[in-house]
């Protein structure tokens, strides 16, 4: 298959025919094998991990031998996700799914708090309620290793080339991405994308109009005006609320350092550490609210962004810790809730504490 035949080859997820070869490449990827062994045998010597590596490769080859379709991969992911949700949450509640047609494809625009869990939770809710799972937009900043790219493309992720900066190349990349999103929707495949680049570390969930302009690149090519084209995408805002953010302290430290020093130097493996912490960390109760399909005319990206934000803020579920952080009085704010917030603050320098409080308070302030 060549780029001429498949204009999306570089960025799209793998299809069924490509699964086996991708899994073979993963098994033969020494960095991937090393990462698993480092996680599983962190306290063992490198000599021991080197000894175990061939056995792990053999085990994975046997275990993955029958995985030959995207659906088979998704069922494996579902199994691990269910185990994770049992041990790291106090339950996940979904609302709004009954409004969606199971035979339609939607563009889900979601607030972004956690790199891996946000799209995983949206997918899980759709799957449990009889809908097809989504194709997930993921930035290439998270794909610095070949094995990371393989893993993401195996699980229905497509690549957003955020690292491209040259204007001409950027226009080409935006055109390809915009076209791919429309092509996916037209062929019955829903899309998940964050409302802006990066997580809302300060708890402020606002849509970047630039994302909406990117969607319309393909519309402009087809000479369709902004309002009409946006309606054709069947945009559905999604609001995810975590009672406890496992990465809240790390986010507050980052915001504090940026405010104090003017910049923040991210560690080499910091994104991976955030992904792991977001998956294995305690999340408390979780609420995933699907909004209404946007059917009204919005003439500008800014006006449409306001409507997406209105739905996300309206459907955001406020937990007791949000109300406490915002200084509200409420019977749900127990001594345990106060103790939980205090415990978090004690882990931060005094100057950084305001950023953690704000991250929980801002969803209240935006209502």
Named regions from a protein language model:
Residues 1-106, 113-118, 123-128, 140-146, ...:
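Membrane-interfacial terminal anchoring regions of lipid-handling membrane enzymes
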Residues 131:
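Post-Walker A helix-loop "phosphate-sensing" segment adjacent to the P-loop in P-loop NTPases
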Residues 135, 139-163, 167-171:
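Conserved nucleotide-cofactor-binding alpha/beta core module
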């Amino acid at each position: 298959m060549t780029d001429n035949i498949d204009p999306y080859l570089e960025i799209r997820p793998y299809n069924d025919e490509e699964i086996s070869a991708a899994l073979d490449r993963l098994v033969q990827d020494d960095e991937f094998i090393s990462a698993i062994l480092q996680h599983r045998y962190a306290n063992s010597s490198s000599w021991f991990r080197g000894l175990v590596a061939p056995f792990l490769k053999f085990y994975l080859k046997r275990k993955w031998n029958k995985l030959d379709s995207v659906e088979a991969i998704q069922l494996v992911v579902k199994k691990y996700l269910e185990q994770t949700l049992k041990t790291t949450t106090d339950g996940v509640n979904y609302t709004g799914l009954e409004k969606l047609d199971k035979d339609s494809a939607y563009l889900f625009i979601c607030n972004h708090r956690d790199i891996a869990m946000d799209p995983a939770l949206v997918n899980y809710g759709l799957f449990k309620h009889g809908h097809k799972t989504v194709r997930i937009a993921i930035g290439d900043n998270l794909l610095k290793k070949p094995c990371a790219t393989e893993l993401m493309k195996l699980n229905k992720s497509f690549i957003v080339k955020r690292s491209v900066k040259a204007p001409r190349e950027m226009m080409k990349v935006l055109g390809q991405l915009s076209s791919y999103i429309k092509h996916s929707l037209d062929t019955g495949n829903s899309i998940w994308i964050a409302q802006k680049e990066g997580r809302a570390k300060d708890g402020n969930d606002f849509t970047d109009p630039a994302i909406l302009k990117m969607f319309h690149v393909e519309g402009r090519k087809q000479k369709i005006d902004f309002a009409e084209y946006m309606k054709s995408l069947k945009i559905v805002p999604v609001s995810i609320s975590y009672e406890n953010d496992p990465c809240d302290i790390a986010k507050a430290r980052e915001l504090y350092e940026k405010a104090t020093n003017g910049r923040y130097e991210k560690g080499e493996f910091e994104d991976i550490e955030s992904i792991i912490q977001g998956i294995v960390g305690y999340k408390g109760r979780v609420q995933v609210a699907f909004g209404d399909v946007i059917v009204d005319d919005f003439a500008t990206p800014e006006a449409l962004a306001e409507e997406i934000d209105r739905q996300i803020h309206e459907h955001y579920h406020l937990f007791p810790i949000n109300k406490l952080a915002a200084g509200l009085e409420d019977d749900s704010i127990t001594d345990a809730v106060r103790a939980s917030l205090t415990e978090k603050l004690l882990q931060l320098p005094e100057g950084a504490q305001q950023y953690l409080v704000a991250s929980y308070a801002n969803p209240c302030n935006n209502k």
